[in-house]
């Protein structure tokens, strides 16, 4: 009696297609509002900050959370924790400039300190909330991990000062959080 064997490539294809069909059939995935893109920075010659935005799965009036990764120089785009989307609108920003998909063609646009990075992020937030005015009234939280612990307080201070001086759109800053461990351990994936 002959034995039937399957090749490894065949098994891989079967696994991939089984994952695709379950992903495409999941309404929580296909209904997920998201977009990505670049915002120009007014204090730069050619810098563009890349962002990835996901709408809350629950309610569009949920808080807005910006996630900043550590590094410095680690892309925020690789930290996609689905549990955040159950309770918030989530923004990932590749920062500082020349991190991830963010770029600049002029070396004078590179930032080397928290104040400059926080100015860029503040300008990014002004552009983001101008494009999404319905989110500007929602509570706003800054969170991240690792080296982002340097950027988070600087950005919170910058947002607070910008609000006090009425420099632009008022950002409804509430609380900041710096994870001492990775967010996988901090938030449940369920």
Swiss-Prot record:
GO BP terms, alphabetized: proteolysis
Annotated glycan sites: 58-59, 105
One example GO MF annotation: serine-type carboxypeptidase activity
CC per GO annotation: extracellular region
Xref: Gene3D superfamilies: alpha/beta hydrolase
Signal peptide: 1-25
Subcellular location: Secreted
Keyword presence, Hydrolase: no
Pfam families in the cross-refs: Peptidase_S10
Keywords: Glycoprotein, Secreted, Signal
Superkingdom of source: Eukaryota
PROSITE patterns hit by this protein: CARBOXYPEPT_SER_SER
PANTHER family, per database record: SERINE CARBOXYPEPTIDASE-LIKE 48 (PTHR11802:SF259), SERINE PROTEASE FAMILY S10 SERINE CARBOXYPEPTIDASE (PTHR11802)
Family designation: Belongs to the peptidase S10 family.
Protein name: Putative serine carboxypeptidase-like 54
